């Protein structure tokens, strides 16, 4: 029963991280709206446009991170409900690690949460080394899929997540 509690803690961390992402995203969207309105009327238009572009990049990164966390959340829920590991769950975790490595927009708070999720998953679940090795190779595909899903969601189109 100890493993179920540990994996439940990972699920809680995932949900906390997703809520914090939503809060950050809302703040960024508000700031972006403000920058866009200022860039229409101010003398410092170039600076406002540059900041707006940076805010859009941060927003896209947060969207991708949210998609990966959503995928992990689904995988962890499945593990809790059926009692054994889903084969592609480690690939999604490795994608989270890759995103963190490349994520210049990750705040220290979110970085710590991502580390807790990653380490908590592997401490709660005994993953065979051959699955972990293949997961590292598949992580790039998962990351690309998450970016594609984030773009679709941003455009207002719905896309099903392949779990």
Q: Which positions does each model-derived feature cover?
A:
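N-terminal interaction modules that seed assembly of large macromolecular complexes
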Residues: 26-63
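Long C-terminal interaction segments enriched in charged/acidic composition
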Residues: 1-33, 51, 67-163
């Amino acid at each position: 029963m100890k493993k179920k509690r540990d994996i439940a803690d990972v699920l809680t961390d995932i949900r906390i991280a997703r809520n914090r992402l939503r809060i950050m995203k809302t703040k960024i969207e508000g700031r972006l709206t403000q920058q866009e309105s200022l860039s229409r009327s101010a003398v410092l238009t170039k600076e406002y446009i540059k900041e707006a572009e940076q805010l859009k990049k941060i927003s896209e990164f947060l969207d991708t991170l949210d998609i990966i966390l959503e995928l992990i959340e689904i995988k962890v829920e499945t593990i809790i409900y059926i009692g054994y590991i889903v084969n592609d769950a480690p690939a999604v975790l490795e994608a989270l690690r890759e995103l963190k490595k490349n994520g210049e927009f990750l705040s220290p708070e979110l970085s710590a949460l991502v580390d807790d999720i990653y380490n908590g998953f592997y401490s709660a679940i005994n993953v065979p080394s051959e699955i972990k090795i293949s997961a590292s190779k598949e992580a790039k595909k998962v990351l690309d899929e998450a970016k594609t899903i984030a773009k679709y969601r941003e455009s207002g189109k719905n896309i099903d997540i392949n779990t």
